[in-house]
């Protein structure tokens, strides 16, 4: 039935494949059995330009006539002449993609023609947002093989190219980053296996088959990419409503032993992915794509942003399919005659499950690809063993009784991963998410028994695609021709131009000849593409595919040296989120035995920019490497960069660093003899943080950009741990240094990860990383681990760690020449590595500082186990070559950069489906815990929504590892396992685990050492700061501020700390604001206010330096809402007599003759007076007494100045005093007041006033007294008579009431006796002159003699009338007496 999208695609879809599928004539003598139709995944029928027929096994009816997308043809479009593939070219695939059991590598080689010799030019242009794929290639001998068997191509090694990119499901069509991919190798052919298009996404799996004439290298890649969501450019929705794309990359490489210069064979198990039926209806669709590559051709790696660079749209609509990927393990062929050592890779990769429409539930499964690189130790004859995984199977059972690496049986409990709380059903009805069985890629290298050549090849196939986000991470093994081994240029990812060139001698042409990767750094959402470096044909490619849902693509870098070179193994795990910058780095350091030259290569990836520098320089792609022509290539830099963790694992050393900060481990060996690579043991889980660079090479730590590090430290995204160590690490590494991990912490949050760890029963695990609480059962195994950062270094940042900074372990073990005897069927030693610890999530607790990695208390035992042991290489004949190499002292330091594995649970999209991570411990050390968590690794998990942060736990290998002993179980399929154990004790203080200059002292404690810390530090590793301020070390007036490793005493304003005392200094401060309008022309021209501060400080120092006792000037600028506040402070010694006026004058002169920048001069000139009085008093108020003093700071010291009339005994007094009464202040001295004055300052004359008033009052009183006395003494005797006779009417007689005698009218003598009664009482009533006062007397009467002469007092007995006579009228009776007074 035709897919709903069949109408969209032009019928000639396969015309695109036509130029790539031209087959060369088979070499004479080469015979291949005809492929069985039942086993053919796809058949390439000859077509005459009209297109070719693509037959999909078991789903033929669903193939609509494919139509290619818009297509740009390159030059030399191939004509319609297309030749059918030779019978030998026919591809075979066993049932379920399994390779037939039994057989040998030789038999596998015979399936391929050996005449692929013609050169061809390939120009492939990819438009990521466009569905254009133009390929121009003249090619012959193209082989499309679907069988899981190893096939030997012609004598020319072939290059593997995996170009599988998927369009962004989230409609990220807006950014069409264009990637130009040009292949110009000579003598290579191109092969495109198949292209399958899911309904909403494009599945493009193309194999560029590049045969070369030097050696045969076969590599098959099955690429399945399923992508959910509809690509924005496609514009049509699926009929089924399901948008799903998934990509599984499986690669196989075999190398035929045609010449001694062959590259190590790389063999990756093939993946068969049967698609499950939608709605339980419709035939299943199995896709199997193989890429064959010549070993000599570089691997061209194309990383695209969310859109796929190559989109081969197959009309077949893929509904949601449950993909059970079964991985057949293929044993790499061994060189019969002195060929370079071959590396076998067994790829067990889990493809992501298909995704349901509407993204109701996206199941993301990251493939756990474990590339195990076994040093040439044991070669297993068994190639046919294969591991098959069925999503619905309860167990994951390897069909062959003898597992290829001695893994007798792999139990995969509960193969179908569980999403959320429920287990994902493996039935075909499941549309929301289909279970994916994950297999691991096991990379095994066989050392050639010739010339001591050591070749190790990393082959990591990590196809992790989430249904939600199409993150297809492809692992690209790279075959390097032995002939061009010595010339190579590091592939450089340039930040601006996403061009990576791999210089190779085999490419005689210039930059065009060098294989170039077009890495589009401008991919939307911060896509990162990383090209691994390759030295001497060491091809490291890190492909990071950004998916719309922030998935990160895990790319493994595989690189090998063959001819006389030390095998260099590097694996780069790139996981980046779309929004977060991931810095992934691949470091390969090669040193010639005769040269001390070394190169450190690093990729620092920042947001949308890829930068690769070689020795600090951008290396342009060139045919020759600038300095690396080396005969001895130190193998070791397996670098794994994870969003939060990068683990560098090597048998010699393991280095863990934060993924945010790319860690570079480079080791160069100067040993004259070819080093014996150590077997990769489960050291990947060891916390061997020691790197073994030679003494001449210093470890270069790549300091990741703060941008990159910051997002990661904050990103909760889980990080897969791809733990691969190069087995070919030379033993003759004279020095090991522990590079310090970057300063960023690894994982912000922890999350649980149920992981099933499979341990091979027959293998002795050198290091069992199985956590104590972890069980082999996948279901029961859910171990939450809290992130532990063992040590936080106080140092702020890490720039680089010189070799001498860490103690090195010297080991020398030349490769014995006996290795040259390896037979054609060497079985790779199945070194058992129980990588069970994967589940707990290895955490890279990365040192935040430049301090060397510290051993965490719980991790490795104090004694570093010797990671050495004779390696038994068994040939099929049973001859065993025992390579005993001197001990390599690798301190087992569980450093802060411990191995960290990402939490195995992946929360896909908004759904809470958790995918348990299962890791099968491969026989080699390599273990990639990278679960299809490509998306998960990236903080892209944000887009995933509920993905909890990975838990990070420092793996304590001390429990699992037998201290001081390392056992390698080397087992041949035909031989009984040989266990070689070597024990050596290593001083725990070799790497100086004590931080902050602490002294390490070895002892017999559990940790094996203790640290003598400096006074400022404490703790087991001297990582805890001591708060010195608790002991009050500062003066009483100073404030103590604790710092990391020290403290600061800060004196108040106006004081300066000198000799432990805050001394008073002359301080002039000011503060002014600059408005925004002014800032637009001056300050804002500077990117940072720090520049303004520095400029002003420089100007002030220049101005005031001429003044005496000048100390310094400080400037502080701060931004406010609409202005910038600038504070100035200038200090002088107290002995200086500088005043504020002096500073103002000097400042004015400086401004007038300003020699600073125009902005600063304008800034200072805008202020009329920079320093103003009172500024210091505002900041430092001495609390003066307002009544008696005021604050002044004119002389640079805030003092209380007394008001007039007041004085101070001390100038520092805050108040003033006045003199006492009777004193006044004269010349600052109190003087007594003059007479009569007193009070304050003698201003009160009260004494004088008192004297005057007292005298006046006394005199007055005296006068009054005298007057009174005088008055009293002066009396008049006549007063009575005067009163009586005052007037004539007044009578003093008591008889006044009686009337007068009328008869008496006159008062003469003759009339007085003539009264009425003859009484004389009336005499008293007379008012005549007789008794009148003297003053009243009439003078005339006196002259006439009328007045009598008697003037006696009245009341007397004497009569007034008759003076001198007795008065008869006087009555003495008291009763009648009347007092007249």
Swiss-Prot record:
Segments of this protein annotated with the region Disordered: 24-108, 301-325, 376-447, 491-529, 612-680, 706-757, 774-830
Stretches in topological domain Extracellular: 30-1248
Domain EGF-like: 985-1023, 1025-1063
Disulfide cross-links: 989-1000, 994-1011, 1013-1022, 1029-1040, 1034-1049, 1051-1062
Sequence ranges of Basic and acidic residues compositional bias: 55-74
Record-level GO cellular component terms: cell-cell junction; external side of plasma membrane; extracellular region
InterPro entries with a match to the protein in the record: EGF-like_Ca-bd_dom, EGF-like_dom, EGF-type_Asp/Asn_hydroxyl_site, EGF_Ca-bd_CS, NOTCH1_EGF-like
Leader peptide range in chain numbering: 1-29
Keyword hit for Repeat: yes
UniProt-recorded Gene Ontology molecular function terms: calcium ion binding
Biased composition regions of type Polar residues, renumbered to the chain: 424-444, 620-648, 774-784, 792-809
Keywords for this protein: Calcium, Cell junction, Cell membrane, Developmental protein, Disulfide bond, EGF-like domain, Glycoprotein, Membrane, Phosphoprotein, Repeat, Secreted, Signal, Transmembrane, Transmembrane helix
Biological process annotations from GO: cardiac atrium morphogenesis; cardiac muscle tissue growth; cell-cell junction organization; endothelial cell morphogenesis; heart development; in utero embryonic development; lung development; lymph circulation
Membrane spanning residue stretches: 1249-1269
Biased composition (Pro residues): 25-37
Biased composition (Low complexity): 38-52, 93-105, 301-316, 508-522, 657-680, 706-748, 810-825
Family annotation (Pfam families): EGF, EGF_CA
Residue numbers of Phosphoserine PTMs: 1359
Subunit structure: Interacts with CCM2 and KRIT1; KRIT1 markedly facilitates interaction with CCM2.
Function description: Receptor component of the CCM signaling pathway which is a crucial regulator of heart and vessel formation and integrity. May act through the stabilization of endothelial cell junctions.
Descriptive protein name: Protein HEG homolog 1
Source species: Homo sapiens (Human)
Lineage: Eukaryota, Metazoa, Chordata, Craniata, Vertebrata
Gene: HEG1
């Amino acid at each position: 039935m035709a897919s709903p999208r069949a109408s969209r695609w032009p019928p000639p879809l396969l015309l695109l494949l036509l130029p790539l599928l031209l087959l060369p004539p088979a070499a004479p003598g080469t015979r291949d059995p005809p492929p069985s139709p039942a086993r053919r995944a796809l058949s390439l029928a000859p077509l005459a330009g009209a297109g070719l027929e693509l037959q999909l096994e078991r789903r033929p009816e669903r193939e609509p006539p494919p139509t290619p997308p818009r297509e740009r043809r390159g030059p030399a479009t191939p004509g319609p002449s297309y030749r059918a593939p030779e019978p030998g070219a026919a591809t075979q695939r066993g049932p379920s993609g399994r390779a037939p059991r039994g057989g040998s590598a030789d038999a596998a080689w015979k399936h391929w023609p050996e005449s692929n010799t013609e050169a061809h030019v390939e120009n492939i242009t990819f438009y990521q947002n466009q569905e254009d794929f133009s390929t121009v290639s003249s090619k012959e001998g193209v082989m499309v093989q679907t069988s899981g068997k190893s096939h030997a191509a012609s004598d020319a090694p072939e290059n593997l190219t995996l170009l599988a990119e998927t369009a962004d499901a989230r409609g990220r069509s807006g950014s069409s980053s264009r990637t130009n991919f040009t292949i110009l190798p000579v003598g290579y052919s191109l092969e495109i296996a198949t292209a399958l298009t899911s309904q909403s996404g494009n599945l493009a799996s193309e194999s560029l088959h590049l045969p070369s004439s030097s050696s045969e290298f076969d590599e098959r890649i099955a690429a399945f990419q399923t992508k959910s969501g509809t690509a924005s450019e496609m514009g049509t929705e699926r009929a089924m409503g399901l948008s799903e794309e998934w990509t599984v990359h499986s690669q196989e490489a075999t190398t035929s032993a045609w010449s001694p210069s062959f590259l190590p064979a790389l063999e990756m198990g093939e993946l068969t992915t049967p698609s499950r039926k939608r709605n339980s209806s419709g035939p299943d669709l199995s896709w199997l794509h193989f890429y064959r590559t010549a070993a000599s051709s570089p691997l061209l790696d194309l990383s695209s942003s969310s859109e796929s660079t190559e989109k081969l749209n197959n009309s077949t609509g893929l509904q949601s399919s449950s993909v059970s990927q079964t991985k057949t393990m293929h044993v790499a062929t061994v060189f019969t005659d002195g060929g370079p050592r071959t590396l076998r890779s067994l790829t067990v990769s889990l493809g992501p499950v298909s995704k349901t429409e509407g993204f109701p539930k996206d199941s993301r499964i990251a493939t756990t690809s474990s590339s195990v690189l076994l040093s040439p130790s044991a070669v297993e004859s068994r190639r046919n063993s294969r591991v098959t995984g069925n999503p619905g199977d309860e167990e994951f059972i390897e069909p062959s009784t003898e597992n290829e690496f001695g893994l007798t049986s792999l139990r995969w409990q509960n193969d179908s991963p569980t999403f959320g709380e429920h287990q994902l059903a493996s039935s075909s009805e499941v549309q929301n998410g289909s279970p994916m069985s994950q297999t691991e890629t096991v990379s095994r290298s066989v050392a050639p028994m010739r010339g001591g050549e050591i070749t190790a090849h990393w082959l990591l196939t990590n196809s992790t695609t989430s249904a939600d986000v199409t993150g297809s991470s492809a692992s690209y093994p790279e075959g390097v021709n032995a002939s061009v081994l010595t010339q190579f240029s590091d592939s450089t990812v340039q930040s601006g131009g996403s061009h990576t060139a791999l210089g190779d001698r085999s490419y005689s042409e210039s930059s065009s000849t060098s294989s170039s990767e077009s890495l589009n750094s401008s991919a939307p959402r911060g896509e990162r593409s990383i090209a691994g470096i390759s030295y001497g044909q060491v091809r490291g490619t890190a492909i990071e595919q950004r998916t719309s849902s922030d998935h990160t693509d895990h790319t493994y870098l595989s690189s090998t040296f063959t001819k006389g070179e030390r095998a260099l193994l590097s694996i780069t795990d790139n996981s980046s989120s779309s929004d977060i910058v991931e810095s992934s780095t691949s470091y390969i350091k090669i040193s010639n035995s005769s040269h001390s030259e070394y190169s450190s290569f690093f990729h620092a990836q920042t947001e949308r920019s890829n930068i690769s520098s070689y020795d600090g320089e951008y290396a342009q792609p060139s045919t020759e490497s600038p300095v690396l022509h080396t005969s001895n290539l130190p193998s070791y830099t397996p670098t794994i960069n994870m969003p939060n963790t990068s683990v560098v694992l090597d048998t010699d050393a393991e280095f863990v660093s934060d993924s945010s900060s790319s860690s570079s481990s480079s080791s160069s060996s100067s040993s004259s003899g070819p080093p014996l690579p150590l077997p990769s043991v489960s050291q990947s889980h060891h916390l061997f943080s020691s790197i073994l660079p030679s003494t001449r090479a210093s470890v270069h730590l790549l300091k990741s950009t703060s941008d990159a590090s910051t997002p990661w430290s904050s990103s909760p995204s889980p990080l897969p741990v791809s733990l691969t160590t190069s087995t070919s690490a030379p033993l003759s590494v004279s020095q090991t240094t522990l590079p310090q991990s970057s300063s960023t912490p690894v994982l912000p949050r922890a999350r649980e990860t149920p992981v099933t760890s499979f341990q091979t029963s027959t293998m002795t695990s050198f290091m069992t990383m199985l956590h104590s609480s972890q069980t082999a059962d996948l279901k029961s195994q859910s171990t939450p681990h809290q992130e532990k950062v063992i040590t936080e270094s106080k140092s702020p940042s890490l720039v680089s760690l010189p070799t001498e900074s860490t103690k090195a372990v010297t080991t020398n073990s030349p490769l014995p020449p006996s290795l040259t005897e390896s037979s054609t069927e060497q079985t790779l030693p199945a070194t058992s590595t129980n990588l069970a610890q994967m589940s707990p999530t290895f955490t890279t607790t990365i040192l935040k500082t430049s301090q060397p990695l510290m051993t965490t208390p719980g991790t490795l035992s104090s004694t570093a186990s010797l990671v050495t042991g004779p390696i038994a290489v068994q040939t099929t004949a049973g001859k065993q070559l025992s390579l005993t190499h001197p001990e390599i002292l690798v301190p087992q330091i569980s450093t802060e950069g411990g191995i960290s594995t990402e939490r195995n649970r992946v929360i896909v999209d908004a759904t809470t489906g958790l995918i348990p991570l299962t890791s099968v411990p491969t026989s080699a050390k390599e273990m990639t815990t990278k679960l299809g968590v490509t998306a998960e690794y990236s903080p892209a998990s944000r887009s995933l929504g509920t993905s909890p942060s990975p838990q990070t736990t420092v793996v304590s290998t001390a429990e699992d590892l037998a201290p001081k002993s390392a056992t390698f179980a080397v087992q041949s399929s035909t031989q009984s396992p040989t266990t070689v154990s070597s024990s050596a004790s290593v001083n725990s203080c070799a790497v100086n685990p004590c931080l902050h200059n602490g002294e390490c002292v070895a002892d017999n404690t559990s940790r094996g050492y203790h640290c003598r810390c400096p006074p400022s530090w404490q703790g087991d590793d001297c990582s805890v700061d001591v708060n010195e301020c608790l002991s009050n070390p500062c003066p009483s007036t100073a404030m103590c501020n604790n710092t990391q490793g020290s403290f600061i005493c800060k004196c108040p304003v106006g004081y300066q700390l000198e000799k432990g005392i805050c001394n008073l200094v002359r301080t002039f401060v000011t503060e002014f604001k600059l408005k925004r309008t002014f800032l637009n022309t001056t300050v804002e021209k500077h990117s940072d206010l720090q520049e303004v501060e520095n400029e002003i400080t420089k100007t002030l120092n220049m101005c005031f330096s001429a003044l005496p006792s000048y100390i310094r000037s400080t400037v502080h600028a701060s931004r406010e809402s609409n202005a910038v506040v600038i504070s100035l402070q200038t200090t002088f010694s107290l002995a200086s007599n500088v005043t504020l006026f002096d500073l103002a004058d000097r400042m004015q002169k400086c401004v007038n003759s300003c020699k600073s920048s125009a902005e600063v001069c304008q800034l200072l000139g805008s202020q009329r007076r920079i320093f103003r009085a009172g500024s210091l008093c505002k900041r430092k108020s001495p609390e003066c007494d307002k009544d008696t003093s005021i604050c002044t700071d004119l002389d640079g010291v805030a003092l209380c100045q007394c008001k007039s009339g007041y004085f101070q005994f001390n100038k520092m007094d805050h108040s003033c005093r006045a003199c006492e009464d009777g004193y006044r202040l004269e010349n600052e001295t109190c003087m007594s007041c003059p007479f009569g004055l007193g009070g304050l300052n003698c201003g009160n004359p009260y004494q004088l006033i008192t004297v005057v008033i007292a005298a006046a009052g006394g005199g007055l009183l005296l006068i009054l007294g005298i007057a009174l006395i005088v008055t009293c003494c002066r009396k008049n005797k006549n007063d009575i008579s005067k009163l009586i006779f005052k007037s004539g009417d007044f009578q003093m007689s008591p008889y006044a009431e009686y009337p007068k005698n009328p008869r008496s009218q006159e008062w003469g003598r003759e009339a007085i006796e003539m009264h009425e009664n003859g009484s004389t009482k009336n005499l008293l009533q007379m008012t005549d002159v007789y008794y009148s006062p003297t003053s009243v007397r009439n003078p005339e009467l006196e002259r006439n003699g009328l007045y009598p002469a008697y003037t006696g007092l009245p009341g007397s007995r004497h009569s007034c009338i008759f003076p001198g006579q007795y008065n008869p009228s006087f009555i003495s009776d008291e009763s009648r007496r009347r007092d007249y007074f």
